[in-house]
């Protein structure tokens, strides 16, 4: 009996969680989220007043959701969902990282990693050459 109860519980959890997926998240709606912000839902009564004044609800918006326009420099800056195969990833400096042009971005990353590793190795070698200059943690 307990095994059957456990099996039914697992099947119910799988059925409930099957439709819940945050894989594509905001990109499925044509805008970007950079994490940590969540969905912002402000005062919905103000939106209700605006829609009631015009007498028409805005069809594209739902209560509690905001639509952020894409950056004007993006190659596909429409409000619609990007077509499949259009993998455009915004980067922090406001530019766009296109997967087809990944070679240049990889080279920049290699140079940055090389500089970090070189700096670390230089510090390590310097500490090996001058052991009296380093900090020592004495046993308590």
UniProtKB/Swiss-Prot annotation:
**Position of the signal peptide:** 1-22
Q: What is its main location?
A: secreted
Q: Please describe the organ and tissue distribution of this protein's expression.
A: Expressed in corpora cardiaca (CC), corpora allata (CA), antennal lobe (AL) and gnathal ganglion (GNG) (at protein level). Expression detected in few animals (at protein level).
Q: State whether keyword Secreted applies.
A: yes
One GO cellular component, as annotated: extracellular region
UniProt-listed GO biological process terms: neuropeptide signaling pathway
**Which positions form S-S bridges?**
26-33
Q: Give its localization.
A: Secreted
Q: Which residues carry this modification: Histidine amide?
A: 37
Assigned keywords, A-Z: Amidation, Cleavage on pair of basic residues, Disulfide bond, Neuropeptide, Secreted, Signal
Q: Which domain of life is it from?
A: Eukaryota
State which residues form the propeptide: 41-140
Purpose: Ligand for the CCHamide-2 receptor CCHa2-R.
Name it: Neuropeptide CCHamide-2
The organism encoding this protein is Agrotis ipsilon
């Amino acid at each position: 009996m307990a095994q059957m109860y456990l099996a039914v519980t697992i099947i119910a959890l799988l059925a409930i969680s099957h439709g819940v997926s945050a894989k594509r998240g905001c990109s499925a709606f044509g805008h970007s989220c950079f994490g940590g912000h969540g969905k912002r839902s402000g005062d919905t009564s103000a939106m209700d007043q605006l829609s009631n004044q015009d007498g028409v609800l805005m069809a594209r918006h739902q209560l509690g959701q905001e639509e952020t326009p894409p950056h004007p420099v993006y190659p596909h800056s429409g409000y619609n969902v990007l077509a499949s195969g259009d993998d455009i990833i915004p980067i922090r400096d406001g530019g766009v990282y296109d997967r087809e042009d990944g070679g240049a971005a990889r080279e920049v990353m290699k140079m940055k990693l090389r500089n970090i590793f070189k700096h670390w190795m230089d510090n390590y070698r310097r500490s090996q050459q001058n052991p009296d200059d380093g900090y020592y943690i004495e046993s308590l």
